[in-house]
Amino acid sequence: FLYVTNHQHVRYNPLKDEWILVSPHRCKRPWSGQTEPPPEHQSDPDPDNPLKAGATRANGQRNPNYTSTYVFPNDFPALLETVPEPPSPDHPLFVSTQAKGTCRVMCFHPDSAMTISLMSVQEILAVIEEWVAQLRDLGGRYRWVQIFENKGAVMGCSNPHPHCQIWASSFLPNESQKQYFEKYGRAMLVDYVEQELIKKERIVLQNSEWVVVVPYWAAWPYETLLLPLDGHPQRLTDLTPNQKLALAEIMKHLNTKYDNLFRCSFPYSMGWHGAPTGAASKDGDSPHWLVHAVYLPPLLRSATVRKFMVGYELLAQTQRDLTPEQAASALASCPHDRHYTSFHGKGNLLGVN
């Protein structure tokens, strides 16, 4: 443990079959680079926000006066359901193929000032139930359904209203997980959860059904994996009522810890990975998969200093300064049952500015 805390080394990510350079000694360097405005919770949200209940969107469509979740087709989709076939390639270096799909927007709550950390467990449970319904609907037609949330302007979110996106298209590669299953006869992430529970070095949160860890191979400073403990669910549609309720609870607690770390509305990209879907899919057909969520937050030292994936990261391999163990310890030390907006004073709850 002392070695990985004090000396540079590389770590292997078996999910992506790639390596991450960890350079803990760089945590001591002074920062004189770009800073961001601290992401704050909205105390006075825009009354004309196009995602709020009853608002009119850019295309003239009016939202209903929804009181819980609300799903609608993305007004500016990246994927369309009807597209022509591309021309045949004239050289093997210039190959393209048809891409079909659909994009939806899902609002979590009618109030633009809300975030997951501020919502009630029952309100978050309604979000999870809608995710399951959307996966069941789109998964019957598409091989991959990607549910993801970009939170905060620093992550490219153009609207601060609590919402996510759902893109249905082709599925992501899963060869590494399949190869591990063929070699060991067990799902890679099932084994990984067992090992993290034994080592107890990177656990942030745990309840009766789920565990949150900073993965051993984390690329982003406070990246986390949200994993089920039992039952080996392959997709969100496999979750039991108890798993869904416990998921709502741990999501609220994790997001509260994130916000409390630097006393800000913590930005991130998050999303769900599960077994591919499609008309040919059926229960239990992808035993190498374990459904899980990934949180990828950019903040590094404070609410104003972010991690940039540039230069070496783009041209060679991912590099990080803070070790995953240090990040897990910092998050684990933050309160999960009380939000920073109910505290007084500034700075973060660990006394680090």
Which functions belong to the PLM regions below?
Residues 1-161, 167-238, 242, 255-256, ...:
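Active-site microenvironments that recognize anionic phosphate/pyrophosphate groups
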Residues 130, 246, 250:
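Charged catalytic carboxylate motif
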